[in-house]
Amino acid sequence: MEISKITSPEDWEYFAKGAANILFKYTGNNDYLKRKLLRLRLLKQEEEYISTCELYDFIELRCKDLFPNQIIDIQLTVLDSNFTNKLNSQGNKLMLNERYGLLLPNILDGDYRKISLSQKCQLYFNDNDQDINSVIFEIKPKWLYDNYTDNYCRTCSLNQLKKVPRHFCPLDLLYTETIEQGLNDLFAPIPQDIYAKIEKLIPLKKLTTIYFNNPDNVFQKLKQYQKINNKNDLIKNLTSYSDVSQNLSLVMTLRDVGLFIKIEKFDKNNHIHTSHNNIKNVYRINDNKSNGTKDQDQEIGTNDEEDNDEKFLITCNIYDLDLKSKMKYKHWLKVENDLQEIYNSSNPNWRYCIKYDQIHH
């Protein structure tokens, strides 16, 4: 599809940008493009550049098999230089010789308030007429693994290196024994009045506790596919770009993805909520029980004894699947070297990360 044939640059406004991409939000009247974003590549050195076609193939052929229900739908679209040149990129330089862009859904479409909880974590919630129907966490899980030896995990060590204040440790969300602590840390920056307002309408703590205790949750899947099974793929063993295997490029990509975790009130009249893909994403909450439950292969809308339970839908979308260039190996080596003195240091302002042996004797 050639985007210039169905829309003009004036229909798109700057939305956000990352290290490698820039997003534009559609503001025109074409129903097909409503609630969509256009993702284009930012200017990069040629040796580190991954083309949009290569990226599209990587997502469709390598990643979707691993996460069939979590990866945001994308569509390849043809660009022309005239269209790209006329976009208001707010001073950001685009890769003008790139012939393709990606169309993707705008998960944040709607009237959402945003609260920044930390550098890599944002909270969005709709606040229409004092009735909160949905909450979205935007989060980067980063490196997920079983820590056996270090005082600080890789993510917490890097944050200390960068002088980023502590928020939460992603490893805490991997284990039943530490999920509560991880969620307490995750929610701590939310202003108390807003947290209370959300909890009154959407039992955030209870629902996220159920979600992270589910062995199929996205953190567990990311941990599974981030695992290095070949010692040659360990960063410390790299000596040149040719040492970077396809598997390591995939692993490093998965260590830098972003997630949208959306929690919303279940609506039996919403065809998306009742779709086959979402049947297993419905969670029941009963105020008379200490914990909620996850619907297990149950048809939505049946008149059973639990019909009075309040139902919620939890969906997770993975975005930012940017295939990592082999040329980044020097950067990876440098960072790993810089972290060596932090892994087993002691910071009075930073609690030690959980070690696997502490909970699995």
UniProtKB/Swiss-Prot annotation:
Function: Has kinase activity and phosphorylates inositol-1,3,4,5,6-pentakisphosphate (Ins(1,3,4,5,6)P5) to produce 1,2,3,4,5,6-hexakisphosphate (InsP6), also known as phytate.
Name by which UniProt lists this protein: Inositol-pentakisphosphate 2-kinase
Location (main, coarse): nucleus
Keywords from the UniProt entry: ATP-binding, Kinase, Nucleotide-binding, Nucleus, Transferase
Catalytic reaction equation(s): 1D-myo-inositol 1,3,4,5,6-pentakisphosphate + ATP = 1D-myo-inositol hexakisphosphate + ADP + H(+)
Domain notes per entry: The EXKPK motif is conserved in inositol-pentakisphosphate 2-kinases of both family 1 and 2.
UniProt entry tagged with the keyword Zinc-finger: no
Motif stretch (EXKPK motif): 138-142
Chain segments carrying region Disordered: 285-304
UniProt cross-references to InterPro entries, sorted A to Z: Ins_P5_2-kin, IP5_2-K_N_lobe
Gene Ontology MF annotations: ATP binding; inositol-1,3,4,5,6-pentakisphosphate 2-kinase activity
Organism this protein belongs to: Candida albicans (strain SC5314 / ATCC MYA-2876) (Yeast)
Record localization: Nucleus
Gene Ontology terms: cellular component: nucleus
E.C. designation(s): 2.7.1.158
Similarity comment text for this entry: Belongs to the IPK1 type 1 family.
Enzyme class, broadest EC rank: transferase
GO biological process: inositol phosphate biosynthetic process; positive regulation of autophagy
Gene3D superfamilies membership: Inositol-pentakisphosphate 2-kinase, N-lobe
Domain of life: Eukaryota
Coiled-coil zones: none
Disulfide bonds: none
